[in-house]
Every structure is written in C-alpha cells, then in structure tokens.
Curated annotation (Swiss-Prot):
Domain of life: Bacteria
Segment forming the signal sequence: 1-43
Main location: secreted
Region Linker, annotated ranges: 333-366
A matching Pfam family: CBM_5_12_2
Gene: celZ
Record-given protein name: Endoglucanase Z
Region of interest called Disordered, as start-end residue ranges on this chain: 336-367
Length: 426
C-alpha cells in the first residue's frame, strides 16, 4: 500500500528435486474408499518455478488467487486475522490458494520494534497455509527496505532455514519501493537478500518489489536480476490504475520477466472509495489471460473500501463480495480446494507420497450411467462459460473407466495423481 495510506522464459527452470504430491490418508494405505479419499486426501502444493515470463506450478504455467492480510503491526487492527482459523476459512470458504502475511517493518509496532511478536504472527499464518495446502507469501512490508538490508537478510535467512524445504513458501523481500532507482537502489538490495536466501534455499520463488509503489515493472524488466526463480511485483488499485499501468505490465512481460501481483484492490490506491467494477474486471481478465498470480488487499475490517469486512463484523463489504467471487472462480487451485484444517498437530493421518495416479489394486465395476464422458467436463471457470475442469469429488468416464478428481484438475483422467480410478464401466 502507498505511504499515503498510512496517514489516515526458454527452458523450464523446475525444482532440482522431482515433483512430488503428498496425500495424507486417514484410511489404510492404498485400500482406500472414495469417501475416504474425498474427505481426507491431501495434495501438497506444486513447487513454483520461473520459465521466461511465466510462473510454473509443476510442469504447467498456472496462476493462483488469494488474499493479503493487513499490516501485522501491533495495534493497527489487522493483527487479529493472523490466525490458523483465518487461513483455514480462506481455504474452505473462499477456495483461496494464496495467503500473504504482510509483516510491517519500520513503522510503529512493526518488526524492528517487536521482532519476536511479528515473526510469530507470520509463522502462524505460514504454518496454517502449509497445513491447508496453500501458498504462503512471507512479505517484508516496507517502503524503504534498502535502509534495513542487514535486518532483512537475517530475517529471510531464518525463514529459509525453517521453511526452505516447503514448496508452499514464497519470499517477498520488498513490498513497495518509493520513487527510487531500480538499478542503483532496489536491485543491489534485492541481490544481497536473494544471495542470502539462496545459500539456504536454492529454489523457492522470490518476489522483488519495483519502483514507484511496485508499478514500474517495465523499468525492472530492462535490467533484470541474474538469478533463478525470481518474479517481480506489480501492484494496482482499480479505482486509480487502468490501461496505462497494464501497458507497463505488458512491456515487462514482453521483455521476458515474470510478474506476481502480491497486492491489488478494487478501490482507490488510498484504500477508499467504492468498487470500480469495470476496471476490476479488466484487471482480472488481464491477470487470468497472462497467468499472473495475485493476492487481494486486504483481509481486514478497517472502515474503508478496500477492507474485506465491515468494522467489527464478518459481513462482507462490496469489495469483499466481489473479491470472494473472483477467488472462488479462479481456474487454478492449490492443493485440495475442498478441505481445511486449523491445527495440523491434531491430524492422525498417514503421510504417503504418491507420484502417479491413485488406483485400487483391482478396480471394481462402477456405475457410469450418469457420469460425463471425457472431455465433457463437469465444472466451469465462469458461470457463463463452458465446462473446463472437474473439482474434488466429481467423476468422469475415460476409456471405459470411471475416475474421480482428487482436487481441481483439467488433466487427462488417470494421467496423474489428481485422479483416482474408481472402477471399470464394463
């Protein structure tokens, strides 16, 4: 968020390790029933990697949508949402794939004043995101991060040691730089922090802020960072930013860098005003068309247009209703969109790595009479669109066999671990 807000491409650069999916099963090893699978199966998120100007999840360019929390600063009001319950609700009710922990740094009540308290808030969110098969953005929420480079390095080293083996975690090392030089100020800071992270975590996605409140992505694209799995921040507010900023984004994409919208709003850039429906829809189309992942600002109940909730309530604002609909209908979902948990320590399930389609040892005869036949999908991305995929628990027939989706999938039935073969239709 701008400071004024405070005053009120190529060869796929995939993970070194093979892509794995984790299924957490509360039933017996592979003798599982469909009911068990749909209610207790867990798919860990796919690792993210940068390929040219796209971010890949596994081996396919995808984008995900979710929510940004408000500043974590003590006493600012948004910290009450830094809970496992909040994250689980986003997963279950919103079908969110991303949650962003916006850890305030220099301002009152932020990390520099209370490092332990703010770090604990971030870790609660990250731990809950991992438990709920979501991506978690660890955000250094600063407008002048170059002034605290050593603190940023120490913080992200600690985060990398704790979470570097989790594909869920994304490092956002600079929120919104002011009107400062990319090449002389932001880039040197970013290179130092990236180097420190990469010494511990060689491959998780790192996002770097860009000049002028993360709008001048075109400037960064002309002098990109020479490191792998780096994306660049684009922020917009639909009431303020329109086609001219999208043109900057197009130029950056044409120059070969990947973008990630870690913060966006339906209203004005100062957080006030009503929802700009036309520009919000234009931005959503732009992000979907270009596979740009995004997190909406802000899951909060402050008395302003950008907030998800009205003050001291769980009633959705105009913006909250709009954003929830956008996230729920986003074409790609992380992990299992159908389940959520608030306390992973109470989970008594068995952790089983599955690298291929899940099948029973001897598929039984299945009732296929009422099932769609591939490629006649069951679910739509948009209410008025054509069916494009299956959601968790939805079945489809392919080559005489009945398959059920374990999570959101548009792959060929039986071709990967997003499917379970229920039985033969013969």
């Amino acid at each position: 968020m701008p400071l004024s807000y405070l005053d009120k491409n190529p060869v796929i650069d995939s993970k070194k390790h093979a892509l794995r999916k984790k299924l957490f099963l509360s039933c017996a090893y592979f003798g599982l029933s469909l009911a068990c699978l749909s209610s207790n199966a867990w798919a860990s998120v796919e690792p993210l990697s940068v390929n040219g100007n796209k971010i890949y999840a596994g081996e396919k360019a995808k984008s995900f949508a979710g929510n940004s929390l408000f500043w974590s600063n003590n006493g600012w009001g948004g910290e009450k949402f830094y809970t496992a319950d909040t994250v689980a609700s986003l997963k279950k009710d919103w079908k969110s794939s991303i949650v962003r922990a916006a850890m305030g740094v220099q301002e009152s009540g932020g990390y520099l004043q209370d490092p332990a308290g703010n770090k604990a808030k971030v870790e609660r969110v990250v731990d809950a995101a991992i438990a709920n098969d979501m991506y978690a953005i660890i955000g250094w929420h600063s407008h002048s991060a170059e002034n605290n480079r050593s603190e940023a390095i120490r913080f992200f080293q600690e985060m990398a040691r704790k979470y570097g083996n989790k594909p869920n975690v994304i490092y956002e090392i600079y929120n919104e730089p002011l009107q400062v030089s990319w090449s002389n100020t932001i880039k040197p800071y970013a290179e130092a922090v990236i180097s420190a992270i990469r010494a511990i975590d060689p491959d998780n996605l790192i996002i770097v802020g860009t000049p002028s409140w993360s709008q001048n992505v075109d400037e960064a694209s002309r002098d990109p960072i020479n490191a792998k799995n780096i994306a660049y921040t684009l922020h917009f507010y639909a009431g303020t930013h329109g086609e001219s900023l999208r043109n900057k984004a197009r130029q950056a994409l044409n120059n070969g860098i990947a973008l990630f919208v870690t913060e966006w709003g339906t209203v004005n850039a100062d957080g006030n005003g009503g929802v700009n429906q036309t520009e919000t829809d234009a931005w959503v189309t732009f992000m979907r068309d270009n596979n740009i992942s995004n997190a909406n600002w802000a899951l909060n109940d402050k008395n302003e247009g950008a907030s998800t909730y009205y003050p001291d309530s769980k009633n959705l604002t105009e913006s909250g209703k709009k954003v929830k609909s956008i996230i729920q209908s986003w074409p790609y979902k992380a992990g299992s969109a159908a389940s959520a948990t608030t306390d992973p320590s109470t989970d008594t399930t068995t952790d089983t790595t599955v690298d291929e389609p899940t099948t029973t040892d001897t598929p039984a005869t299945a009732d296929c009479a009422n099932a769609n036949v591939y490629p006649n999908w069951v679910s739509k991305d948009w209410a008025g669109g054509q069916p494009t995929h299956n959601e968790a628990g939805q079945s489809i027939v392919y080559k005489g066999n009945l398959y059920t989706a374990n999570w959101y999938t548009a792959s060929v039935p039986g071709s990967d671990s997003s499917w379970t073969q229920v039985g033969s239709c013969n």
